[in-house]
Amino acid sequence: MDVVNPYFRSSDYSALLKKLGVELIAPVFANTTLDTPVLPPEIFSIFNMENADIFIDAGGDDVGATALGQLHRQIETAGYEMLYVVNRYRVLSTKPEETLPLLREIETASHLKATAIVNNSNLAVQTDMQTVLNAVPFAKKAAELCHLPLLYSTVPDFAVENTLPEGFKAVKRYVRFVWEDETE
C-alpha cells in the first residue's frame, strides 16, 4: 500500500514493482502533488489474501499512520508486525531520545503498537559500512528507550564490504532521486 509521500511514492514505480511481482495498492491521486493520507477501497482486499506478505509503508510520522489507523481493527485481527524504522541521520531524530515521542505519535495515530525497531540509518549514496556501524549505538539506545527489540540494521548492497555480521541485512536500492546521477 502506498500512503502518499512527497519524497518517495511507490506509485511512481508501479511498473518496476509489478515487474518484481509486487501488487501495488495506491490512492487514485497517488501520482499527483496531493499529500493526503486516504486509503483506496481496494485496501480491504489485503485481508482476504492467503499466504501473502503484506507491507504497508505509512511513512515516518503520524500523518501516514492516521490512514493506517483506519484499518487497525482488521490488522489486529489478522496479526501483524509493526516495524519502527529509525535513521540517525534524519533531521527529526538525530538523538535516540527523539525517537520515542515520534514512535508514540505514530502508535497513537495508527491505534497499533510497534513490535520492533529496524535501524535504516543512511546518507543515501554517500552511505558506507562505517556510516551504518556508527549508527548502531544510536539504534540500540533508541530500542532501549522505546522498550522494543532491535530487529536488525540495514546496509545498502553497494556498501557491503564482506560478509555482514549478525544483526545486519543488505538491502537493494531500486530507485533514485531525480537529482542523483544515473551512475551513482
Which role does the model predict for each range below?
Residues 1, 56, 86:
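Active-site flanking residues adjacent to catalytic metal/cofactor-binding acidic residues
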Residues 1-37, 42:
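N-terminal phosphate/diphosphate-binding loop that engages ATP/GTP or pyrophosphate donors
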